[in-house]
């Protein structure tokens, strides 16, 4: 029972707390440079863009948290979070993508259309989702309802890993998300095992 509760809590944390497909797909081969340091998550590591500013994590469920500056210095910035819970906790790629979709709505109040893709990089199976619409941002306070943010986007990625899946989530204004999609793809595809100590 405890393991089931941990799994449920993990999926809730990843989902948000907790566009549409006419957007052209961005090639994974886009010319995007990464200059930032390597960041460890579980037994893996990723290359982080220097323009992403690391922040103190807001909960123990977050393995890392970054603020992405707004476009042209105006409006809202974006938030990138990576989650890691260990082996067997956090849910499958399908479950988490469904949870992410459940936080985004279209103008009629229905779940927003989502673009889901799967690929393999460096031997790791990766599932990704792109969603645009109204984001129901969950506030981590009892009794406080979600805060709707219109014209927002969500990028999500799940890297399947025997030592525990890695979950990436990037939320922000639609234009910011669209502009950063190639960079997000590069971060996800930068996954590598950490070097083992001799």
Tell me what each language-model feature is:
Residues 2-8, 14-78, 84-124, 132-198:
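N-terminal targeting sequences that direct proteins away from the cytosol to non-cytosolic compartments
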